[in-house]
Amino acid sequence: MKPVKPPRINGRVPVLSAQEAVNYIPDEATLCVLGAGGGILEATTLITALADKYKQTQTPRNLSIISPTGLGDRADRGISPLAQEGLVKWALCGHWGQSPRISELAEQNKIIAYNYPQGVLTQTLRAAAAHQPGIISDIGIGTFVDPRQQGGKLNEVTKEDLIKLVEFDNKEYLYYKAIAPDIAFIRATTCDSEGYATFEDEVMYLDALVIAQAVHNNGGIVMMQVQKMVKKATLHPKSVRIPGYLVDIVVVDPDQTQLYGGAPVNRFISGDFTLDDSTKLSLPLNQRKLVARRALFEMRKGAVGNVGVGIADGIGLVAREEGCADDFILTVETGPIGGITSQGIAFGANVNTRAILDMTSQFDFYHGGGLDVCYLSFAEVDQHGNVGVHKFNGKIMGTGGFIDISATSKKIIFCGTLTAGSLKTEITDGKLNIVQEGRVKKFIRELPEITFSGKIALERGLDVRYITERAVFTLKEDGLHLIEIAPGVDLQKDILDKMDFTPVISPELKLMDERLFIDAAMGFVLPEAAH
């Protein structure tokens, strides 16, 4: 049963309290939630109202949740408040780990749970808006979303196949089914009395328009949270990102903040102010900076790259320290282009950003092979060069944009530490010292589930590196080759004994560049791109 929309009076969009708005959500509805980590574009007031209503009335029941981007704080925010038995029965997310209460329901087999690559998921919403049955893509071939593996299913109670293997002109593709949502929770900064909305205080746009179109064109209700309303037709047309006819309900929250906590809006993050070049932003010399420094060595002048969340996200600050940050462009899958990448849960809240695309268009560029290089963090690596990030130690994290980005980038740089779990290192006298070894080996013999396929990368002619604080590997047809080790570490004791398989030792094995281990600017000069 489709939800019943509140009527417009004289063209004005209905303005309701959040509590009144969620009363329009029927049982069994499919709810699509906009937002990214740290509160970016999160309609928190609507989410809270829905969670509170269910606690009090046990309605609505058996919702299906679609969340393209990981929103939350890796604890109790985001869509975690909706993790109540009976409220949610089914979920399809691009990323799961930012809202771990929902992940726990999936881990406990209490909900049906799917994971599409983040870019693919937003493209299926665009397909739903156009009344197309789904999308056909080679993104995800050879990974756990491939139906010959797990087909994107995250637990034992998830049975229906949403992804199918198809073939055109003797080439394999994946068909991803598009799910049309009934309800949207989206957010903007300002709207007029007819619902036309602008995003002036927001960090980015994500796929707000795509979600609104998908819900509207399938007879659903678009609920939009804003910080303020203004008179009809007073917003600049070039600033309007959501046309009013897509919006069915507006909820005004005058206390809406750009991110979780803090000031209502940071003008550097919204792009209104530019951070002066003299402003000192630096990382202490530790294993995180060491990995970022070595990763920077893989960059070339004029390259367009992507940087992912985690240990990889320090590369922008290292480039700024070295004075070469303007010689290449780093992008984030959620839309930002250029600038200084943020770190932590509000990843993508950049400063000095050069441009911001909608997320769906950003992924179109990635899928088409537009990236020269990408920097992604890894959880586990196996002897075939496969990488796992979406599920490990029994925890569901989801892929985010990892599969979308790594599938076609010309050079792929995986960043991480060789071991995990209480690893402590120090860098002194130009050497790396292992003060306390990590409890967990991250280089294992076989991955149970694959997020990046080494085999497919080699077939596509991609250049793959794995950079850790003590060793650098490259991927070849016969597996991982160890090509560099850190000064101060023992090859056998500190590297080979801490792996569950033995890599090929390169005959040209060398020490990592000594400049990486000095607590001063490296004097690094970005190489020219090869032609």
Swiss-Prot record:
Its EC number is 2.8.3.8. GO terms for biological process: ketone body catabolic process; protein homotetramerization; short-chain fatty acid metabolic process. It comes from the Bacteria. Signal peptide: none annotated. The keyword Lipoprotein does not apply. SMART domains: CoA_trans. It holds the Pfam family CoA_trans. Keywords: Transferase. The active site is at residue 333. It catalyses: an acyl-CoA + acetate = a carboxylate + acetyl-CoA. It is an enzyme of class 2 (transferase). One of its GO terms (molecular function) is acetate CoA-transferase activity. Belongs to the 3-oxoacid CoA-transferase family. Homotetramer; dimer of dimers. CoA transferase having broad substrate specificity for short-chain acyl-CoA thioesters with the activity decreasing when the length of the carboxylic acid chain exceeds four carbons. May play a role in short-chain fatty acid metabolism in E.coli. Formation of the covalent enzyme-CoA thioester intermediate proceeds via an unstable anhydride species formed between the carboxylate group of the catalytic glutamate of the enzyme and the carbonyl carbon of the thioester linkage of the substrate. This is Acetate CoA-transferase YdiF. It comes from Escherichia coli (strain K12). The gene is ydiF.
